[in-house]
Amino acid sequence: GVQTCALPILGLDSVRQFQVVTSGGQAEFGRASGGFVNVLTKSGTNEWHGDLFGYLRNRHLNAANALSGTALPLTQSQYGASLGGPVVRDRTFLFTNFEQRIQNQAGLIAIAPSSVAAVNARLDAVGYAGPRISTGLYSNPVRLWSYLGKIDHRFRGDDQFTVRYNTYDTWSRNQRGAGGLSAASASSDLDNRDHTIVASYIRTLSPRTQNEVRGQMGYSDLKAPPSDLTGPAVSIS
């Protein structure tokens, strides 16, 4: 199955704190009977501050795959930036974060060469006009983008309003259904974009009492078109 709702996936540098509750959650977290993880995002402060980071994994440093006996051509680069600070000192604060991952990788089809030859011979016999199947490596590139923008505003007193927008974009080819005993022509691509908007207003009624109103809207646009419209969908069991 696949997800049926937009899930906020955050960049590494936008996370301020993790809260892990194994049981006995408060009412604000709904009717969850088990444990849950609450992720708190960063906010701007009265000082402008930014970060840059980068990560690179090169295919020449990979170990050999146990099935193919050769190193899979995996190259991954991941980088991002964040910036936060005051729009109006002591009142309004901005925080923003961007992250991207570029992953050039390959999957492995382990169909025996004799089975590949038998399937292709059958396709030839019936006059199939599409491409033939193959074994070995197939391309599986992945691109991920994440963006977060957050504004906090403090009213006079201790009241506070927060609005946050987050988008997460995924692009991948031959993402689902290929590998092992399934040919690459049996796979589907993945084009997915999630949008999430969260707003909250905290009203301080007394030194011991607060009231919070919170709302969220999520939208997910998930597409999984076939990777190969003309190739045979071969899966051996």
Protein language model features and the residues they cover:
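Short, small-residue-biased leader/transition segments that mark boundaries at the very start
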Residues: 1-7
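Hydrophobic, lipid-facing positions within transmembrane beta-strands of outer-membrane proteins
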Residues: 33-35, 77-81, 145-149, 193-199, ...
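Membrane-embedded beta-strand positions of outer-membrane beta-barrel proteins
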Residues: 50-54, 83, 96, 163, ...
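Outer-envelope beta-barrel architecture signal
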Residues: 14, 44-48, 77, 90-94, ...
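A beta-strand signature from Gram-negative outer-membrane beta-barrel systems
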Residues: 10-55, 63, 78-91
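Short sequence motifs at beta-strands and strand-loop junctions characteristic
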Residues: 29-31, 72-76, 139-143, 155, ...
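Transmembrane beta-strands of outer-membrane beta-barrel pores
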Residues: 24, 54-60, 69, 100-104, ...
